[in-house]
Design a protein with these regions (language model features):
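Surface-exposed cleft-lining segments at the edges of enzyme active sites
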Residues: 1-3, 39-45, 74-78
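A short, acidic, amphipathic alpha-helical segment used as a generic capping/interface helix at domain edges
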Residues: 83-97
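Conserved catalytic cores of phosphodiester-cleaving nucleases, focusing on short active-site segments
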Residues: 56-58, 62-74, 87
Length: 146
């Protein structure tokens, strides 16, 4: 239960931060092809993206789609499950479904993670952002306008 509470709070914080940064929230829906994804400047909450669910799907300003997975790990042992066996696997599936130029998988992390698990996830194509500094995520999103 503790993990779910932390994850729920993290997701609400992301939701509020995206809205405060000018993104518009749209209805969740299955995204089986990228033309069904939220358009630039919009996002939806948990939705099927290809074969796997994403916590958030964002339409980036440059036409790509970001898939954000929120993860909370209370121990370095759990970090393998949360990051490598879930979020990084989803990244690989989304790359297969949509291609590496069209989709940007992001793990938004809170808690305790082993360095080698973080490196492994990044090597598999997962961008990592820390939940305590969502300004970093907002700045990155803004850079997709240029």
């Amino acid at each position: 239960m503790r993990r779910n509470k932390g994850k729920d709070e993290q997701e609400q914080h992301v939701n509020d931060t995206l809205i405060a940064s000018g993104f518009q929230k749209v209805a969740s829906r299955p995204v089986l092809t990228l033309n069904k994804a939220p358009g630039p400047g919009t996002f939806c909450r948990e939705s099927l993206l290809g074969e796997r669910k994403a916590d958030f799907i964002l339409g980036l300003w440059d036409g790509r789609v970001a898939a954000i997975e929120c993860k909370v790990s209370n121990s370095s042992t759990n970090s393998v499950k949360r990051l490598n066996n879930d979020a990084a696997v989803k990244a690989e599936v989304w790359f297969r479904d949509f291609g590496t130029r069209q989709i940007v998988p992001v793990a938004l992390l809170s808690g305790v993670y082993k360095i080698h698990n973080l490196e492994s996830a990044q090597n598999r194509g997962l961008a990592i952002v820390w939940a305590h500094d969502l300004n970093e995520l907002v700045q990155w999103i803004r850079q997709t306008k240029t």
